[in-house]
Amino acid sequence: PRGRITQMIGIPTSGMTTLAHKIIANAQGGQGAAVYIDLSGTFDPDYAIRCGVMLDRLLLVRPKTITQTLDIARDLFNEGKLTLVLLDLLNERDTTRPRDVGTMLRKLHEPLAKSRTAALFLLNAPQRPQWQALEEYTDIRLLIQRQTWLYQERDIRGYRVQVTILKDKSSPGEKHIILDLTFDDAVKGNGA
């Protein structure tokens, strides 16, 4: 949701990056603009294109530290002109103290709430201690888990993922959604 934080948690090959790219592509529809803050340095432009991301309408930022990442995000939220800011924290190895990250997240909260921008944080499971404070500011928290590979004859054509809604401030209670992610740019499932 706009003006709020959504957190996606998963492990490599869980489908989280594919879903994130699909969310960016959706946000870019109707002239929306998105920013990908790539602290982990793992953004793959070719894969993003296959997921529908329009690179000419995506600003890619590669900060070096958590502090730079959150300062950039705060500045973007203050501008209030973006549809989506995605913060890819999957492989970050910064040693910023959890208390300092909590302070920076507090400074993000107000400008984000006043903006029309959605914030999407991508984090590995299990979470690193620095990001425990993020849970306080998160409106929606999703756990992404790959269930099985999908085959077409002998070839792997995709995978089935389970999205578990761990937290949703507007609709309490854990929920599960199954999605099929295929390598031909299609995402099908009961979560549409």
Where are these regions (language model features)?
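Short, ordered loop/turn segments at secondary-structure junctions
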Residues: 39-41, 63-65, 89-92, 124-126, ...
